[in-house]
Regions:
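Conserved beta-strand signature within the Rossmann-like core of class I S-adenosyl-L-methionine
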Residues: 102-104, 131-139
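Conserved Class I S-adenosyl-L-methionine
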Residues: 142-166
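Conserved alpha-helix/loop element of class I SAM-dependent methyltransferases that forms part
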Residues: 1-10
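A short acidic, Gly/Pro-enriched loop at the edge of an enzyme's catalytic core
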Residues: 93-102
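SAM/dcSAM-binding transferase cores
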Residues: 56-59, 73-80, 85, 95, ...
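Class I S-adenosyl-L-methionine-dependent methyltransferase module
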Residues: 9, 23-94
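Class I SAM-dependent methyltransferase "Motif I" SAM/SAH-binding loop
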Residues: 12-20, 139-140
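A short glycine-rich, Lys/Arg-flanked "PGG" loop and its adjoining helix->strand segment in the class I
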Residues: 115-132
């Protein structure tokens, strides 16, 4: 995307938790593109105690950086900057300035936290995503995938971790390489349900021209 060409990668993280997404992603970006700068925004309903963070990460730079980010709400150095917006993510999304190159969607499951897996939230995420950007979530639930499809995302399989089901990866528009396709039977079932379900059926996917980040 444009941000990556400029040497800046912007990432939105819905569900900060212990900061695992932050640490793993920063390490990978720095390994692949040492000169890139990462701008990170996390949305979190309620932060975990600092002691939990420190127990998980122990000593070292990662622990120090994440502790500062959580305790102050922001962090800024040459390689990366971050900020955490605490509160209802649906409200925080309205105040965000996109576009983001990548989005992690890791709130509690659709069964435990259904409001964060609605079509409205998925559309709000679509609107702050760069054209050609990627959304990744651990969830393989039909509810999550249906909401993503209804909001205009292209969806595919995420990587399988151990015995867990593959998560879901979605893109705003086409990407290269393409997403790993769902099984045909699974995709047909989702498309049929998308057409049948009241509420989702009436929510037309936004056209590229409707997105706030269209080029």
């Amino acid at each position: 995307g444009r941000a990556q060409l400029a040497g800046v990668v912007r990432i939105l993280d819905v569900g900060f938790g212990l900061g695992v997404n932050v640490a793993v992603t920063l390490e990978e970006i720095h390994r692949q593109v040492p000169d890139a700068r990462c701008e990170w925004v996390s949305l979190e309903k309620e932060l975990l105690p600092l002691v939990d963070l420190q127990e998980h990460w122990g000593e070292g730079k990662v622990a120090r950086d994440l502790t500062e980010l959580v305790s102050k709400g922001s962090f800024d150095e040459e390689f990366w900057s971050g900020r955490i917006l605490v509160g209802d993510a649906r409200d925080s999304l309205r105040s965000l300035n996109g576009p983001f190159d990548a989005i992690y969607l890791d709130p509690f499951s659709p069964a435990r936290n259904p409001e964060m897996w609605s079509v409205e939230v998925m559309r709000a995420l679509w609107e702050v995503c760069e054209e050609g950007g990627i959304l990744s979530t651990y969830s393989s639930a039909a509810k999550a995938r249906l909401a993503l499809m209804a909001a205009g995302w292209e969806i595919g399989l995420g990587p399988r971790v151990g015995r867990k089901s593959s998560g879901t990866v979605a893109s705003r528009g086409s990407v290269d390489p393409p997403l790993m396709a769902l099984e045909e039977k699974q995709r047909r079932s989702l498309e049929r349900r998308l057409n049948e379900e009241t509420g989702i059926n009436g929510c037309d996917p936004p056209s590229p021209a409707a997105g706030i980040n269209s080029p």
